[in-house]
């Protein structure tokens, strides 16, 4: 495969990988070894399933941030028998030493921190093409880009006009990449779609895309919503963001968070973790919400619930965490105070209307940190160009909490690959007993000892002694 060089890295291009620097592999391996000690769930799955290889025959196209923690996930999938190809799901989220460690270990990986949008879609195509002419039969997705590429490409095979009117820069490059592929192979996407046995989706944004396809009757294969496993959403989204948000803001700006006025837009699990993160360092935190239940939760936690437009000229730090688009628009951006910090911890870059800032003066301070001069003369500090700040400006969530999420991913891949015929073309969640198993696998590492129910106690509350302990409708 041939690729152009990313602006920020000299690429090493080999037959079946594209990374920044293979010389970083040893560094990546050392960090990977440390991460393994903090990821007991994945290591337990290797011990439990490594001999039986339940994923033997699985060809997994992985589109998920190429980090050290993801490297542990990849090697777990391989240990369980899978054949894997990998790309990052964000142009800024790759850790180049992690990608190098994977390439050195023989994993076809296509990921460079700071890759262009054109390269991003080239790399996503690369995970769909096996060297022997084969195709993936499973997708492991984060944000839905790999799944969406297959689906949109299939539509374009029937009606190329679906690619006529891109609505933003991202779509411009996506549509161009599909046209380029179809010019070479007019049935590429439909062949892949026909072979996919199932998709497992990591995050809120991608799950929303899957449910939209299910509702319209367009979902062509079963999917597991990993995001809404309790041991994902209530841990990764909440506790992961609680640690990684302020880590990224401080790495990027070196500002003192204490004493600052901060606005978190969105108070779902990600917003809750983000608000705790900022409050924990002494910021005065306000919340903007559309959902009355989430707004009331925020108020009960002592946050002021406000409208963005009412406080936009007062805040020092803005964080979007909604999964929606055009949440902070130009009408808000131009009113911000001097040196306000603006960032996003949702999935895509369109929560903040970054496109509307392109006509202003930009001064790049360092990678993923830009000073933008507004018409008022005030300057704002935009982090990661509005993309995921915790992966663009730092290294994402800690290994331990990602072990929860990725243990769910592996179990979901096993479930759909080995029992796919038992599932319809719908979106599912993992059963409660597996959710509890994921939690159980992580307790010993942090010194927890579970109390055990007696048979009489279990009978009294009508649950098995060994669990599950809560009904599916229980809200943790």
Swiss-Prot record:
Subcellular location, record wording: Cytoplasm
Enzyme Commission number, as recorded: 3.13.2.1
GO biological process, one term: S-adenosylmethionine cycle
MF annotations from Gene Ontology: adenosylhomocysteinase activity
Chain's role: May play a key role in the regulation of the intracellular concentration of adenosylhomocysteine.
Keywords: Cytoplasm, Hydrolase, NAD, One-carbon metabolism
Catalytic EC class: hydrolase
UniProt-annotated binding residues for NAD(+): 203-205, 237, 266-271, 289, 324, 345-347, 390
Domain of life: Bacteria
Pathway annotation: Amino-acid biosynthesis; L-homocysteine biosynthesis; L-homocysteine from S-adenosyl-L-homocysteine: step 1/1
Reactions it catalyzes: S-adenosyl-L-homocysteine + H2O = L-homocysteine + adenosine
Full protein name: Adenosylhomocysteinase
Any one cellular-component term (Gene Ontology): cytosol
InterPro entries: Adenosylhomocyst_ase-like_sf, Adenosylhomocysteinase-like, Ado_hCys_hydrolase_NAD-bd, NAD(P)-bd_dom_sf, S-Ado-L-homoCys_hydrolase_CS
Entry similarity comment: Belongs to the adenosylhomocysteinase family.
Pfam families the UniProt entry points to: AdoHcyase, AdoHcyase_NAD
Key word Magnesium present: no
Cofactor binding annotation: Binds 1 NAD(+) per subunit.
Cofactor: NAD(+)
Binding site for substrate: 67, 142, 202, 232, 236
């Amino acid at each position: 495969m041939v690729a152009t060089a990313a602006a920020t890295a000299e690429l090493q291009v080999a037959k079946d990988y594209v990374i920044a620097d293979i010389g970083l592999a040893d560094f990546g391996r050392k960090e990977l070894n440390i991460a393994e000690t903090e990821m007991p769930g994945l290591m337990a799955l290797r011990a439990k399933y490594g001999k039986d290889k339940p994923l033997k025959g699985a060809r997994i196209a992985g589109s998920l941030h190429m980090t050290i923690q993801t490297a542990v996930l990849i090697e777990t999938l391989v240990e369980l028998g899978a054949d894997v190809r990998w790309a990052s799901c964000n142009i800024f989220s790759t850790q180049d030493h992690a990608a190098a460690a994977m390439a050195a270990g023989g994993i076809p990986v296509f990921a460079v921190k700071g890759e262009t949008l054109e390269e991003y879609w080239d790399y996503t195509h690369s995970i769909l093409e096996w060297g022997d002419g084969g195709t993936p039969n499973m997708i492991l997705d984060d944000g839905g880009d790999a799944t969406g590429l297959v689906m949109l490409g299939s539509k374009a095979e029937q009606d190329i006009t679906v690619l006529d009117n891109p609505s933003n820069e991202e779509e411009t490059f996506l549509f161009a990449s599909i046209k380029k592929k179809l010019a070479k192979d007019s049935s590429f996407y439909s062949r892949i779609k026909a072979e996919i046995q199932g998709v497992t989706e990591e995050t809120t944004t991608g799950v929303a895309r899957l449910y939209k396809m299910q509702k319209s009757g367009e979902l062509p294969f079963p999917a597991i919503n990993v995001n809404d496993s309790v041991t994902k959403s209530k841990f990764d989204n909440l506790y992961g963001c609680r640690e990684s948000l302020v880590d990224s803001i401080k790495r990027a700006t070196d500002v003192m968070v204490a004493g600052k006025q901060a606005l978190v837009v969105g108070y779902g699990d990600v917003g809750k973790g983000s608000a705790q993160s900022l409050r924990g360092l002494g910021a005065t935190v306000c919340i903007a919400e559309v959902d009355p239940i989430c707004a009331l939760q925020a108020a009960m936690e002592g946050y002021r619930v406000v409208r963005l437009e009412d406080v936009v000229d007062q805040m020092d730090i803005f964080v979007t965490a909604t999964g929606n688009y055009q949440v902070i628009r130009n009408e808000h951006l131009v009113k911000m105070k001097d040196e306000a910090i603006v960032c996003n911890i949702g999935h895509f870059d369109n929560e903040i209307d970054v496109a509307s800032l392109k006509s202003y003066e930009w001064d790049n301070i360092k990678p993923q940190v830009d000073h933008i001069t507004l018409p008022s003369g005030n300057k704002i500090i935009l982090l990661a160009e509005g993309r995921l700040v915790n992966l663009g400006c730092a290294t994402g969530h800690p290994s331990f909490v990602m072990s929860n999420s990725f243990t769910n991913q592996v179990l979901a891949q096993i479930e759909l690959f080995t029992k796919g015929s038992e599932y319809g073309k719908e979106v599912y969640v993992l059963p409660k007993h597996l959710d509890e198993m994921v939690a159980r696998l992580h307790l010993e590492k942090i010194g927890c000892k579970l109390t055990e129910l007696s048979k009489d106690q279990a009978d009294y509350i009508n649950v098995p002694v060994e669990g599950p302990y809560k009904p599916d409708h229980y809200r943790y």
